[in-house]
A protein has these predicted regions:
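Hydrophobic alpha-helical signal-anchor/transmembrane segments
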Residues: 1-5
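Single-pass alpha-helical transmembrane signal-anchor segments
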Residues: 6-29
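Amphipathic, interface-forming alpha-helical segments with heptad-repeat character
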Residues: 32, 40-49, 61-189
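Tight coil/turn sites that cap or link beta-strands
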Residues: 35, 52-54
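Short linear S-[DN]-x-LW-Φ motif typified by the pepsin-like aspartic protease active-site region
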Residues: 55-61
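Long, charge-rich amphipathic alpha-helical coiled-coil "stalk/tentacle" segments
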Residues: 177-210
Length: 210
């Protein structure tokens, strides 16, 4: 009887140990999905970054502080500014950015609102670039402006662990009054060209009859 009780106690103890071991393993092993990065802290201090795959941490000592999305994000910016020839325009720009894999910790610890900071840099860069150009030049050189803005903003965001992938200026819209004036000028130019072509056609007809 005593032997049976001893065996039962041993089995219970073994079961408890197995449960504890399994619990420790479950608390230790974690999987990082594709296009994510986990920041691990040890006793509340930064320890390391883990990328996609299966990893282990020390239970009750290490913890996953944050899960960072490594995909490319997009930010759209719209602002009003004035060109060199005093035309008010609404500029619409789009920029793509992502966390630099080599600076995941910097991106997390240094910048609380990356999209807000990026928006501020974009607006400042555009307000510096567009007023230096006439309306016609702004239209003609918008790709160059976008490239310069990308370089300027990219250098600023790199300090915080972010990479600016691509920046585009998708629209430069003059005020409605300017649009109306431009339409009138274009219409007058088209009418002038049409008149010239009609006169040329009549001249050719007269020569043909002669």
């Amino acid at each position: 009887m005593g032997v049976l009780v001893g065996m039962t106690g041993a089995l219970i103890m073994s079961g408890v140990i197995v449960v504890i071991v399994l619990a420790v393993l479950c608390a230790s092993i974690f999987i990082v999905p594709q296009q994510q990065a986990y920041i691990i802290e040890r006793f509340g201090k930064y320890n390391k970054v883990q990328f996609a795959g299966i990893h282990a941490k020390i239970p009750f000592v290490d913890r996953i502080s944050t899960k960072t999305n490594m995909r490319v994000s997009q930010l759209n910016v719209q602002l009003e500014t004035k060109t060199l020839d005093n035309v008010f325009v609404t500029v619409v720009a789009s920029t793509q950015f992502r966390v630099n894999p080599e600076n995941v910790a910097t991106a997390y610890y240094e910048l609380r609102d990356p999209a807000g900071q990026l928006r501020s840099y974009m607006e400042d860069a555009l307000r510096s670039a567009i007023p230096a150009l006439s309306l016609d030049d702004a239209f003609a050189r918008k790709d160059d402006v976008a490239f310069d803005v990308q370089k300027t903003v990219g250098a600023e965001m790199a300090r915080f662990g972010f990479t600016v992938v691509k920046t585009l200026i998708t629209a430069i819209d003059p005020s409605p009054q300017v649009k109306s004036a431009m339409d009138s000028i274009n219409a007058a130019q088209r009418e002038k060209e049409a008149t010239r072509q009609r006169a040329e056609a009549q001249r050719i007809q007269k020569i043909g009859r002669a």
